[in-house]
């Protein structure tokens, strides 16, 4: 991932020193080096509040809470992104597996992977996303 930092496909500029200051070590390793947080440890794995999940690096809105579901995999799972333009997909052949990596389309941050074992009554997709790659913005409660 770090070799993609200057990839012209990603318009959001990233300065490594600034990212290291702003992100936690886990957020940095996940988003910049495609690390994976341990299952069932992420802040948003069990979050059920209404709101929007944003890229922790650039703030792009990525997923709505209405697309989140409990897959039992240990990471937050969504059946679709907020729209088709916010996600970049790339084949990933690491760790002896063939998977589809999911990145933020604005900054290239590694988010997780997408699999074809999601809810069949929705999209059939499971966007398996590291909590460390996300910030959650709760919707204000109505009074």
From Swiss-Prot:
Domain MsrB span(s) in chain numbering: 16-139
UniProt-recorded Gene Ontology molecular function terms: peptide-methionine (R)-S-oxide reductase activity; zinc ion binding
**Active site positions:** 128 (nucleophile)
Q: Which GO terms describe its cellular component?
A: cytoplasm
The residues the record assigns to binding Zn(2+) are: 55, 58, 104, 107
Enzymatic reactions = L-methionyl-[protein] + [thioredoxin]-disulfide + H2O = L-methionyl-(R)-S-oxide-[protein] + [thioredoxin]-dithiol
List the EC numbers from the record: 1.8.4.12
Work out whether the entry's keyword set contains Oxidoreductase.
Answer: yes
In its UniProt record, which GO terms are filed under biological process?
protein repair; response to oxidative stress
Source organism, top-level taxon: Bacteria
Query: What UniProt keywords are attached to this protein's entry?
Result: Metal-binding, Oxidoreductase, Zinc
Cofactor binding description: Binds 1 zinc ion per subunit. The zinc ion is important for the structural integrity of the protein.
Q: Which cofactor does it need?
A: Zn(2+)
Q: Does the keyword Metal-binding apply?
A: yes
Family affiliation: Belongs to the MsrB Met sulfoxide reductase family.
Q: Which PANTHER family match?
A: METHIONINE SULFOXIDE REDUCTASE (PTHR10173), METHIONINE-R-SULFOXIDE REDUCTASE B1 (PTHR10173:SF52)
Record's protein name: Peptide methionine sulfoxide reductase MsrB
Gene, per the UniProt record: msrB
């Amino acid at each position: 991932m770090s070799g993609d930092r200057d990839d012209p496909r990603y318009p959001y500029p990233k300065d490594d020193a600034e990212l290291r200051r702003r992100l936690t070590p886990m957020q940095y390793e996940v988003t910049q080096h495609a690390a994976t947080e341990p299952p069932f440890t992420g802040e948003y794995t069990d979050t059920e509040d209404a709101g929007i999940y944003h890229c922790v690096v650039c703030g792009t809105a990525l997923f709505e809470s209405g697309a989140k579901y409990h897959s039992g995999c240990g990471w937050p799972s969504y059946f679709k992104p907020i729209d088709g333009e916010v996600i970049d997909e790339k084949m990933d052949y690491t760790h002896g597996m063939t998977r589809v990596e999911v990145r933020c389309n604005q900054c290239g941050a590694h988010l997780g992977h997408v699999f074809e074992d999601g809810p069949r009554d929705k999209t059939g997709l499971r966007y398996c996303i590291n909590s460390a790659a996300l910030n959650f913005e709760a919707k204000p409660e109505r009074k």
